Design a protein with these regions (language model features):
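Asp-based, Mg2+/Mn2+-dependent phosphohydrolase catalytic module
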Residues: 1-7, 99, 108-226
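N-terminal helical cap/lid subdomain that shapes the substrate entry/recognition surface
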Residues: 2-99, 107-109, 120
Length: 226
């Protein structure tokens, strides 16, 4: 068990609050096959990054706007199996609403659709791909999130599940909790995660005065990916 003090929490969404793994894999695999690309490679690259970045990487000479719109439309339509990760709803409900934000690589429209489908509350403070010029792994999304909650990034804790997001949080100056929900633990550690836990069920709000005091359980359960 570890005790962490911070001023605010900045959550990634997919892989942290919402289990959209299968939907993401279906959409990006289909797109990869259509363009003669390796589906596994594309799916892995797409996690935690703005969809436009992945489109540009794999189709440098393609119609980026059209392909990105195609991806987003399919993602908004494919909600099968989409659920909240264990502990996500309880943790969000326990936190003061002005002390947490969602910082996601999704567009606002897609993020809102997925939050509704998963039964999670819409945050008071929302940073999406539409709000920044440079997405993760650049620090811009988390710098904007920290500014929006009213604290320096160094006083915030980022909760992430993939290397691109962890690097973004660290580059912004925040501490980062990595979740074992999407990639192997060594990838989280190599990206710079300060603590690694199974999922949001392993993060609890112990007290709230001027600062949030969190308790995190870094022990790995046998059934998790690591």
């Amino acid at each position: 068990m570890h005790s962490i003090s911070c001023s605010a929490l900045l959550f990634d969404m997919d892989g942290v609050l919402i289990d959209s793994t299968h939907a993401v894999a279906r959409v990006w695999s289909q797109w990869a096959v259509e363009h003669g690309l390796d589906p596994d490679e594309v799916v892995h690259a797409a996690h935690g990054r703005p969809s436009m970045s992945t489109v540009k990487d794999y189709l440098p000479n393609g119609d980026h706007e059209a392909e990105n719109l195609k991806i987003e439309r399919r993602e908004m339509e494919d909600l099968d199996g989409l659920v909240a990760w264990p502990g996500a709803l309880a943790l969000l409900n326990a936190l003061p609403p002005e002390r947490w934000a969602i910082v996601t690589s999704c567009t606002r429209a897609l993020a809102e659709v997925r939050l509704r489908a998963a039964g999670l509350p819409r945050p008071h403070i929302f940073v999406t791909a539409s709000d920044v010029v440079r997405g993760k792994p650049f620090p811009d999304p988390y710098l904007k999130g920290a500014h929006a909650v009213g604290f320096p990034a160094r006083e915030c804790v980022v909760v992430e599940d993939v290397p691109a997001g962890i690097r973004a949080g660290k580059a912004a100056g925040a501490s980062v909790i990595g979740l074992r929900t999407t990639v192997a633990e060594r990838e989280l550690r190599d990206a710079g995660a300060d603590w690694i836990v199974d999922n949001c069920a392993k993060i609890a709000l112990e007290s709230y005065r001027n600062q949030l005091t969190l308790v995190v359980d870094t022990r790995m359960e046998r059934a998790t990916h690591g």
